[in-house]
């Protein structure tokens, strides 16, 4: 089991109260997955790009040994 490294420095008096004010136990707002307030500006798969066009670039720079052997 790993130990949590708190950010409160040297705890002197009340360790439980110091941990309650640590960022580990801060309040978090959950984002709705569906319904009101669930719109996400960036899509789920928006950063993948166009995968069909990327494969065409690889074939453009590909050279074979047949071209080199015909020059001799």
UniProtKB/Swiss-Prot annotation:
Name of protein: Alternative ribosome-rescue factor A
Cysteines engaged in disulfide bonds, as pairs: none
Region of interest (Disordered), residue spans: 30-53
Domain of life the protein comes from: Bacteria
Function: Rescues ribosomes stalled at the 3' end of non-stop mRNAs. This activity is crucial when the stalled ribosome cannot be rescued by the SsrA(tmRNA)-SmpB quality control system. Binds the 30S subunit, contacting 16S rRNA with the N-terminus near the decoding center and its C-terminus in the mRNA entry channel; contacts change in the presence of release factor 2 (RF2, also named PrfB). Requires RF2/PrfB to hydrolyze stalled peptidyl-tRNA on the ribosome; recruits and probably helps position RF2/PrfB correctly in the ribosomal A site so RF2's GGQ motif can hydrolyze the peptidyl-tRNA bond.
Effect of residue 35 to C: About 50% ribosome rescue activity, initial rate
Subunit structure: Interacts with the 50S ribosomal subunit. Interacts with RF2/PrfB on the ribosome. Contacts ribosomal protein S12 (rpsL).
GO MF terms, alphabetically ordered: ribosomal large subunit binding; rRNA binding; tRNA binding
Summary of the knockout phenotype: Cells lacking this gene are viable, but those lacking both arfA and ssrA are non-viable.
Biological processes, Gene Ontology terms: regulation of translation; rescue of stalled ribosome
Family, per entry: Belongs to the alternative ribosome-rescue factor A family.
Miscellaneous notes: Active protein is only produced when SsrA(tmRNA)-SmpB-mediated trans translation is limited. ArfA can be synthesized from truncated mRNA, via ribonuclease 3 and the SsrA tagging system. The arfA mRNA is cleaved by ribonuclease 3 within a hairpin structure, probably immediately after the Gly-55 codon, which produces a truncated non-stop transcript and leads to ribosome arrest. In the presence of SsrA, the stalled ribosome is rescued and the incomplete nascent ArfA is tagged for degradation. In the absence of SsrA, truncated ArfA chains are released from the ribosome and are functional.
Consequence of substituting residue 30 to A: No change in kcat for peptidyl-transferase by RF2
UniProt biased composition (Basic residues): 33-47
Alphabetic keyword roster: RNA-binding, rRNA-binding, Translation regulation, tRNA-binding
Gene from which the chain derives: arfA
């Amino acid at each position: 089991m790993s130990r949590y490294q708190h950010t409160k420095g040297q705890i002197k008096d009340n360790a439980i109260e110091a941990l309650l004010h640590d960022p580990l136990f801060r309040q978090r707002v959950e984002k709705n997955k569906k319904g009101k307030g669930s719109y996400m500006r960036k899509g789920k798969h928006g950063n993948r790009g166009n995968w069909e066009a990327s494969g065409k670039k690889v074939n453009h720079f590909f050279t074979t040994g047949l071209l080199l052997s015909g020059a001799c």
